[in-house]
């Protein structure tokens, strides 16, 4: 157990009573320590243990508590002014700090303090929220949003306008997770703690939440909340039992392994589905 976990857990039970005026110095320091460790990647809201993801709920609780202990304040990044409770990640970064971190941030990109960005990542004009973890070699494309506490794997491509849901608004139990080597097509939305398995390809305009049916056309199986590894997914519809209407679903049209994916472009995988 982390040394400050019990303090965070206890404070969360009494969170309604915590304000910037009433928070104890000990609790404030503990919360700020969690945000700092999230920011540098030493802590994560969720970690993979074997084949399963384990959520560190106490870390998520610390993120939520951080909004209780600070007042809004004016922030200035040299171009824009903000009025918020959470600092921007790069507010005091020097050129040397950016070079050491080893990722690229283009004008218009915003990341909040408490998010982690790994080496060889590119942030186009996009938004990365507090508690999020973006792993190595990932592209966060223009107008993509990585929600609070979301976990993005290695070598992921989040295309233009993609939305990866957070846990803060509305409050969710588990973070949304995109595993390594996934491609998420433009304007798609993955939310509500859905897990997209390693090596999957999500086509443009696919929306998946916990209540979305994920239909495997090869097996006829319907599943919820998790896209199996290596899935190629497009948007579709499933008819009602009486045939009077159909409702939206996500359709797994094929499965691909790493070898096939390495030899095949994304466009080719999505053709002829």
From Swiss-Prot:
PROSITE patterns (alphabetical): HEXAPEP_TRANSFERASES
Keywords per UniProt: Acyltransferase, Amino-acid biosynthesis, Cytoplasm, Diaminopimelate biosynthesis, Lysine biosynthesis, Repeat, Transferase
One term under GO cellular component: cytoplasm
Enzyme class: transferase
Location of this chain's protein in the cell: Cytoplasm
Catalytic activity: (S)-2,3,4,5-tetrahydrodipicolinate + succinyl-CoA + H2O = (S)-2-succinylamino-6-oxoheptanedioate + CoA
KW Lipoprotein (keyword) present: no
Amino-acid positions noted as binding substrate in the UniProt annotation, renumbered to this chain: 104, 141
Keyword field contains Cell membrane: no
InterPro entries on file: DapD_Trfase_Hexpep_rpt_fam, Hexapep, Hexapep_transf_CS, THP_succinylTrfase_dom1, THP_succinylTrfase_N_sf, Trimer_LpxA-like_sf
Biological-process GO terms, alphabetical: diaminopimelate biosynthetic process; lysine biosynthetic process via diaminopimelate
EC assignment: 2.3.1.117
Pathway: Amino-acid biosynthesis; L-lysine biosynthesis via DAP pathway; LL-2,6-diaminopimelate from (S)-tetrahydrodipicolinate (succinylase route): step 1/3
MF GO annotations: 2,3,4,5-tetrahydropyridine-2,6-dicarboxylate N-succinyltransferase activity; nucleotidyltransferase activity
Cited PANTHER family: 2,3,4,5-TETRAHYDROPYRIDINE-2,6-DICARBOXYLATE N-SUCCINYLTRANSFERASE, MOLYBDENUM COFACTOR GUANYLYLTRANSFERASE
NCBIfam families in UniProt: dapD, PRK11830.1
Subunit structure: Homotrimer.
Similarity comment text for this entry: Belongs to the transferase hexapeptide repeat family.
Name listed for the protein in its UniProt record: 2,3,4,5-tetrahydropyridine-2,6-dicarboxylate N-succinyltransferase
């Amino acid at each position: 157990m982390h040394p400050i976990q019990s303090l965070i857990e206890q404070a969360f039970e009494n969170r309604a009573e915590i304000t910037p005026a009433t928070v104890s110095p000990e609790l404030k320091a503990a919360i700020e320590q969690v945000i700092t460790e999230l920011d540098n990647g030493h802590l994560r809201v969720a970690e993979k243990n074997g084949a399963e993801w384990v959520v560190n709920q106490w870390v998520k609780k610390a993120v939520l508590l951080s909004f209780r202990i600070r007042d809004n304040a004016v922030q200035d990044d040299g171009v824009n002014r903000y009025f918020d409770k959470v600092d921007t990640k790069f507010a005091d970064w020097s050129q040397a700090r950016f070079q050491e971190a080893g990722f690229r941030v283009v004008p218009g990109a915003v990341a909040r303090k408490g998010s982690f960005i790994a080496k060889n990542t590119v942030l186009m004009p996009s938004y990365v929220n507090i508690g999020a973890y973006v792993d190595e070699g990932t592209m966060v494309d223009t107008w993509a949003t990585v929600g609070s506490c979301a976990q993005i794997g290695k070598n992921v491509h989040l295309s233009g306008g993609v939305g990866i849901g957070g846990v803060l608004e509305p409050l969710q139990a588990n973070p949304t997770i995109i595993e390594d080597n996934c491609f998420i097509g433009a304007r798609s939305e993955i939310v509500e703690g859905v897990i997209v398995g390693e090596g999957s390809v999500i086509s443009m305009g696919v929306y998946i939440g916990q209540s979305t049916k994920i239909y495997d056309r090869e097996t006829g199986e319907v599943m919820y909340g998790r896209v199996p590894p290596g899935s190629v997914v497009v948007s579709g519809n499933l008819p009602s039992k009486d045939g009077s209407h159909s409702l939206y679903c996500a359709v797994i049209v094929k499965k691909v392994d790493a070898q096939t994916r390495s030899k095949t472009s994304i466009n080719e995988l999505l053709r002829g589905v």
